[in-house]
């Protein structure tokens, strides 16, 4: 029998009011006045992982790390990887190279000061590295990150490079890009790595997709989600568009149970360890 493949379990540590789609309703200068729910939700995720003996990677905002350093230390103390999600959840595509570099450097310094460990991984908010700003990979390498997980090789209205490699690749600057998982069907890539699709579609489909990546491609999958996705009690933004409300709030009440099944059905580890020998 073939050995069970260990997949990468990743969590983007941001709160509901920091989501790109809700940015018009929560200006950054007002974030400190908004009730924050991230700590309780991440603690629930840590307990869930511990119950399955699983490890993961937490791509954490520097802004949150400054305000909840104890949470960051708990993540690291439990054996998980603390990686960077930038400082203020600004899309890379909205920044100049100089501003982007400053943002990801600040986040790295904050996280390393809190944990005492090197921070080697980075994920751009909203997978905002696309064909128009591939310069971002050079900035990421320049700051000292070893890998990025910022490209989603799919067609989407807000992100994606549909023809990007489906599996990790090494750039000329030495940086390894670890794209979110997809499956190939009908001549295109389909999302298979979590996020809103994990909530919207039946769990059986996500399970089949990850199993397909493991069995047909013989590769580890990389899965992602956010702490707010297990929090059906979060404040509702009624002023958001119907499309945004649907995408953000659909099936929040079921996500934690689905994660529990996911952790049971597959083997999970940290991205830096799962993809240590990638590319």
Model-identified regions with their sequence ranges:
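Metal-dependent polysaccharide deacetylase catalytic core of the NodB/CE4 family, i.e.
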Residues: 52-133, 145, 150-155, 182
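Generic structural signal for well-ordered alpha-helices
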Residues: 42-46, 69-73, 101-108, 137, ...
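Active-site beta->alpha N-cap acidic-glycine motif
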Residues: 2-78
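C-terminal domain-boundary segment and adjacent tail
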Residues: 201-279
């Amino acid at each position: 029998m073939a050995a069970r493949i260990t997949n990468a379990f990743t969590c983007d540590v941001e709160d509901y009011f920091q989501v790109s789609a809700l940015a018009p309703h929560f200006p950054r200068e007002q974030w400190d006045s908004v009730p924050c729910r991230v700590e309780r939700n991440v603690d629930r995720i840590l307990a869930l992982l511990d119950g399955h003996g699983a490890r993961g990677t937490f791509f954490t905002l520097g802004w949150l790390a400054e305000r909840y350093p104890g949470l960051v230390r708990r993540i690291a103390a439990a054996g998980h990887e603390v990686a960077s999600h930038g400082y203020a959840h600004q899309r890379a595509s909205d920044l100049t190279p100089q501003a982007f570099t400053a943002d990801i450097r600040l986040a790295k310094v904050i996280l390393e000061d809190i944990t005492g460990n090197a921070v080697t991984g980075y994920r751009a908010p909203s997978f905002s590295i696309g064909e128009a700003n591939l310069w971002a990979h050079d900035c990421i390498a320049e700051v000292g990150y070893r890998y990025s997980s910022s490209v989603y090789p799919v067609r989407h209205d807000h992100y994606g490079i549909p023809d990007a490699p489906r599996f990790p690749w090494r750039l000329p600057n030495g940086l390894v890009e670890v794209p979110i998982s997809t499956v190939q069907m009908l001549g295109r890539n389909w999302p298979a790595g979590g996020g809103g699709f994990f909530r919207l579609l039946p769990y059986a489909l996500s399970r089949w997709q990850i199993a397909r990546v493991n069995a047909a491609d013989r590769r580890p999958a990389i899965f992602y989600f956010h702490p707010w996705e297990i929090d059906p009690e979060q404040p509702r933004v009624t002023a958001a568009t119907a499309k945004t409300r649907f995408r953000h709030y659909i099936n929040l009440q079921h996500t934690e149970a689905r994660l529990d099944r996911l952790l049971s059905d597959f083997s999970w580890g940290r991205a830096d360890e799962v993809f240590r020998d990638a590319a």
